[in-house]
């Protein structure tokens, strides 16, 4: 299923900047960045639960926030993009 993950991490402190880097790094491991602090991830249920747990452990819920939008498996008709797209589609294979 496609899961859209967005986050807002308070970066006023060094600890906040560290949390921001950690959240972004985890999201990169599971999907692709489509905008600052916005990732598209193709996940199964187990991966979704695991990533949510990892990210929740990183953030400070007093000053940071996470949002998860579960768009399901039929997401191609639910996503519209306008403008420059600088990457592969989230479901395309990249061979290195």
What do these predicted regions represent?
Residues 70-80:
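Short, highly charge-biased, low-complexity peptide segments
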Residues 35-65, 70-72:
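Short, intrinsically disordered low-complexity segments
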Residues 25-28, 52-57, 80-82:
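Intrinsically disordered, low-complexity boundary segments flanking structured domains
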Residues 6, 11-13, 56, 77, ...:
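Residue-identity detector for threonine
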Residues 1-34, 38, 42, 46-47:
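Extended, hydrophobic alpha-helical segments
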Residues 15, 49-51, 78:
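Short acidic, gly/pro-rich beta-turn/loop elements at beta-sheet edges
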Residues 58-61, 65, 79-91, 95-96:
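Terminal, non-globular segments
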């Amino acid at each position: 299923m496609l899961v859209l993950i967005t986050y807002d991490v308070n970066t006023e402190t060094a600890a906040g900047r560290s949390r921001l880097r950690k959240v972004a790094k985890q999201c990169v491991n599971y999907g692709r960045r489509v905008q600052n602090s916005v990732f598209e991830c193709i996940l199964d249920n187990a991966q979704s639960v695991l990533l949510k747990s990892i990210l929740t452990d990183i953030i400070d819920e007093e000053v940071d926030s996470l949002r998860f939008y579960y768009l399901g498996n039929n997401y191609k008709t639910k996503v519209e993009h306008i403008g420059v797209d600088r990457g592969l589609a989230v479901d395309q294979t990249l061979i290195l």
